[in-house]
Amino acid sequence: MTTVLLTSTSGPLSDDAARSVRELVALETERLGVPPLSEQPLLNLRDPRARVVHIMDTQGGDVTGYAQLDVSREGGSLELTARCADRTQCVGALLNEAELIAQDHDVVVRPWVHGDDPDVTRVLAQRGYVPARTLLVLSRDLSLADTQALATPVVPEGFVCRRFDPISDADSLLAANSDAFSWHPEQGRLTHHDLSMRMKEPWFTPDHLHVVTPVSESARIVGFVWLKAEPHSRSIELYVLGVTEAAQGQGVGRFLTELATVTALNQGYPRLHLYVEADNTRALALYTQHGFAPMERHVNFTQPTGELGHEPPS
């Protein structure tokens, strides 16, 4: 049996530790076909404001197991991965440590499994965790026919569309995002700091973020679409598409979906993909009409029995 020696720390990781975690994630991404950690935990690695605890197993100077637990007031989200001689044992040890830390911070552990990771899924099932939420990744191939059909998306009457201005539009974008995603546990909480962190990422460009406003109120954003183009990727992500409650049902969402498709085509991407909640029937219907189909799933687990002294989420 392999000895698993864990260390845990809050606050930003050192450059070397963060680099080692990213290397672990890259290796496991190549093996699994899906990144085992999502975007936010990677942003948190060096963020001094992130309210998270980093849990690491280190062998020979390399990080061979990593977990990140959100210990904020609304927290409990856990993402983890490992590349050990006994991977199941390492995953179990990371989960044990996360559960103990969660008790100290009075949060409920809610682990994520991204894509198909049988080792993590098996450990969670053995501990009594059950699926509570599912994110779907939808994808569609782009073709010349799309270029001809969507050559000029038409802005709905009464609205105008323009490129995002990072200086003057930040407040309005965050307000629109909060309204459009008031029901969403992560996206609806986007802050100025979160937006700033994403705008510092190498993939960010204002050319990939468009906003829709009423003709008479050019500063009030009621819809927006944001594309994310990772370096060396053949697929571009429809990163966020949001429409405020008051603007829904007026064709804004359909227009923004068509705009995203045309933008991807014009920049030479053969594929467009996006994330959507499995129970968001309105969004699923819209994307299905535009040719998107499920490609992978990401499942969030919880313990309904309130084991380890935790209460289930209300």
UniProtKB/Swiss-Prot annotation:
The question of whether Plastid is a record keyword is answered with no
Q: Where does acetyl-CoA 2 bind?
A: L241, G242, V243, Q248, G249, Q250, G251, V252, G253, R254
Give GO terms: molecular function aspect only: mycothiol synthase activity
Listed under GO biological process in this entry are: mycothiol biosynthetic process
EC number from the UniProt entry: 2.3.1.189
The cross-references to CDD domains, in alphabetical order and at most eight, read: NAT_SF
> What is this enzyme's catalytic activity, as reactions?
1D-myo-inositol 2-(L-cysteinylamino)-2-deoxy-alpha-D-glucopyranoside + acetyl-CoA = mycothiol + CoA + H(+)
Q: Which residues bind acetyl-CoA 1?
A: L80, T81, A82
Annotated positions binding 1D-myo-inositol 2-(L-cysteinylamino)-2-deoxy-alpha-D-glucopyranoside: E39, E186, K228, E237, Y275
Tell me the Pfam families matching this sequence. Answer: Acetyltransf_1
Taxonomically, the superkingdom here is Bacteria
Keyword Amino-acid biosynthesis (UniProt) = no
Q: Which InterPro entries match?
A: Acyl_CoA_acyltransferase, Bact_Acetyltransf, GNAT_dom, Mycothiol_AcTrfase
Q: What top-tier enzyme class does this entry carry?
A: transferase
UniProt keyword annotations, A-Z: Acyltransferase, Repeat, Transferase
Every copy of the N-acetyltransferase domain together lies at 159-313
Q: What does this protein do?
A: Catalyzes the transfer of acetyl from acetyl-CoA to desacetylmycothiol (Cys-GlcN-Ins) to form mycothiol.
Whom does it interact with, and what assembly results?
Monomer.
Q: Tell me the protein family, please.
A: Belongs to the acetyltransferase family. MshD subfamily.
- Give the protein's recorded name: Mycothiol acetyltransferase
> What organism is this sequence from?
Jonesia denitrificans (strain ATCC 14870 / DSM 20603 / BCRC 15368 / CIP 55.134 / JCM 11481 / NBRC 15587 / NCTC 10816 / Prevot 55134) (Listeria denitrificans)
